[in-house]
Amino acid sequence: MKRLLTGLIMLVCFAGSTSYAQGQDNQTDASAVKDTIAKVHAAISSLDISKMEPLWFHNAYVMLVNPKNKSVSIGWDDVKKNWENAFNFWSHIKVTQTAGPYVRVDGNVAWSTGLTNTNAKAKNGTSLNLPTFESDVLRKDSDGEWKLEAHSAWRASQ
């Protein structure tokens, strides 16, 4: 009986430590995803495609919808062109996280939602300040870095 009880206690402790370790891994991954989202916002604010490029997978499956878009950009070439057009349109843009990001990690895939405030000025002088809802899908690459597979942002109702 003592052996059985000792075995059960060891099993529970091992299972608990495994769950704890997995929870810690998810927390570490969630923090890394949040860091990637912050880098995306910094890249947008920099208006510099060279800062955006390393944050994305460069494949035929990535997708992007920005608030001004009327269609979805699919594939890295279209996504890159979308960002270049956006960066050429604005003379200033600042994206500030106001809620979230709320991150869920499942293995090598993560998704994130959040609210941001976008303050921008177009090269033609038009200014805007609006709340934006964002949704992102990320995947961990072979080097353990979280990169975007999809980003969509649209105006939140005011």
Spans of features found by a protein language model:
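Beta-strand elements of well-folded, non-transmembrane domains
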Residues: 118-122, 138
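Positively charged n-region of N-terminal signal peptides that target proteins for export
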Residues: 1-4
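A short hydrophobic beta-strand element
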Residues: 107-118
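Structural motif
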Residues: 58, 106, 141-142
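Short beta-strand edge/turn micro-motifs at domain boundaries
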Residues: 129-158
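Short, low-complexity N-terminal intrinsically disordered segments enriched in polar/charged residues
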Residues: 19-55
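A solvent-exposed, acidic/Ser-Thr-rich amphipathic alpha-helical stretch
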Residues: 28-32, 49-102, 115, 129-130
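Bacterial N-terminal signal peptides
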Residues: 7-16
